[in-house]
């Protein structure tokens, strides 16, 4: 790579940084005054002319300055040397805030709120995917001899509680047998096969009697719990942040808000995240969604012990602080996985 090309990239990097910070088109004199580029204003003007000819920057109609294009942002992101890590104090604060969540729902609500505050963009977190969760533990609590509370706890921290009306009361020995049978059928199995296992248990046990009745009724309730598709749920935070950047979206803000409300497009983008720790940046038309033509999406996956629970990320204008956003998304995802994995 030649020195002229390296220098032009430094000019591009400076244009991106200044435009993100100021929202104002950037001129050559401004770049020379603000950045130690080591060349004259005339050289910077020539470099900007080349960058414009190659499609990395463009000139708004009402200004003599230049702004980055989607191609320019992509070049900037692809050539990020490093992403500034968070300080140990910042990391401790994030972990402490998430650890204070009382359950899965609370942890994810805290995460989406925190990410929106850190990035000043729209944050999205997907509920743990049914297809990757396993049953960690099943608890059976007798509320009365004929009424049970079933508690399903998954490896992703999801806790689902269901009441079972038995009709016929069972004694302590039968309760213990029921607990053992259901636990053996479910614990350690993926949710996608656990529902089949508990149905098979009820079928194989068959017959009459109080235990068979209790297994059958419990199985019916558990199947309903296990087949709920919670991966189709998204938590959103910071939607009001979009209104701060209305001009950045041109006339596409309404369609973007509709896409967020319907969730389908966002879920499709998050579904592509299959590897925790890897952050993906999609800029403008790279989202392959017409509704998001003026937006950038920074996504990753969260999980624990090598298993992906779900996707999460940030959505905002292409005029985005990419290094800061990437760092924040990666950090919050890391600590969500750590918190859920330790529960």
Curated annotation (Swiss-Prot):
Electron transport is among the record's keywords: no
Gene3D superfamilies reported for this sequence: 3.30.450.40, Heat-inducible transcription repressor hrca homolog, domain 3, Winged helix-like DNA-binding domain superfamily/Winged helix DNA-binding domain
GO MF: DNA binding
SUPFAM superfamilies: GAF domain-like (SSF55781), Winged helix' DNA-binding domain (SSF46785)
Keywords assigned: Repressor, Stress response, Transcription, Transcription regulation
GO biological process, one term: negative regulation of DNA-templated transcription
InterPro entries in alphabetical order: GAF-like_dom_sf, HrcA, HrcA_C, WH-like_DNA-bd_sf, WH_DNA-bd_sf, WHTH_transcript_rep_HrcA_IDD
NCBIfam families, A to Z: hrcA
Entry similarity comment: Belongs to the HrcA family.
Role of this protein: Negative regulator of class I heat shock genes (grpE-dnaK-dnaJ and groELS operons). Prevents heat-shock induction of these operons.
Name of protein: Heat-inducible transcription repressor HrcA
Taxonomic placement: Bacteria, Bacillati, Actinomycetota, Actinomycetes, Mycobacteriales
Gene: hrcA
